[in-house]
Amino acid sequence: MLVVPAVTGFTVPSASAACPAVEVIFARGRLEPPGAGQIGNNFVSGLRSKTGKNVNLYAVNYPADNQIDVGANDMSARVQSTMAGCPNTRIVLGGYSLGAAVTDVTLAVPFPFFGFNNPLPPDAEQHIAAVALFGNGSAWAGPIGAFNPVYRDRTIELCHGVDPVCNPSDPNTWEANWSDHAAQAYINSGMVKQAVDFVAGRL
């Protein structure tokens, strides 16, 4: 007869045991190699140091060329899977350049639109703690809070110097000012740290 000794103090881990305190879902800029990009990685590294929390980084899976809808569908899917599997995890959305546009669509379009066919459910706002956008071309149309007021106070949008993507200007000056759009310019200027401080205060 096989006797199994009693084990005391053992608890079966729940699904939430493996859940991070914070899930950052970040979309890289146009033509950056797969991953979260320089700004995304720098932002998450800073957030981990600032908060001391378990911060997971999910890099939005999309080509980062012109297919904003593909990125928005993936970002939305990740938000929804995090909500379902880790309901207590605080979600942070972010993006740089084209990735900021991906985030705009995810948050501002509540219905299927062209190739975007996976809109967020209404209760997503209860899980999304903050949004950080860098070099966002939406400045030409208005900030994300103008399209979805729920996120107005949760969003930080940063535009470096005369970055022509987020600073509407004469097209003739774009080439001369393009260096202000570089990811490293945002990092070196302290704007990524500024976003870290903002987001940390909302977690």
Predicted ranges, named:
Residues A146-N172:
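Surface-exposed loop and adjacent secondary-structure segments within mature catalytic domains
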Residues F113-A130:
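Short mixed-charge
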